[in-house]
Amino acid sequence: LIVRDQDSFKRNLNLYIVSEDADRNLTTSSPLLKNNIKTWLNQYRMINDTIDILDPKIINIKINFSAVTDTSTDKTEALNVAITEIQDLFTEKLDIGQPIYITKIYDVLNNLDEIVDVTNVEIINQNGGLYSDETLNLKQYTSADGRILYSPENVIYELKYPNLDIQGTIR
């Protein structure tokens, strides 16, 4: 993601890059990679332009949801199907600055045969331990109607461990 630096009096561009580790988890890029990119870009930039290559904040998230099934549906099976569908929704990594449409999660769950209604979807910041140390007040970036979780231009959201970071309650 390339963003014009609004705080700069010069023609400065901020280029945010992120890398993946061997397990396909997001990680900061090495100084060597940043230097190689900067060297390559220098041959194409205007003389007055400056480019800063920066790491975005990696915000690890967790998704909690509550749903209702009819009395004839096996609740364990419904929960497993629902979690799998949300995992499929997050198979591709998000882009830097890309919002999360909470309504898509509602839509995916509501379209399941096993689910009668989705009563709640909540996205929570996971940090520390196995997760990034970065924190972000997600409520501040959630739309007033709760449909979209916006992302600052220097942030990338990651569902790092889909098998652990999606939890649901079925009633």
What are these regions (language model features)?
Residues L1-R171:
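Acidic, low-complexity glycine/serine/threonine-rich segments
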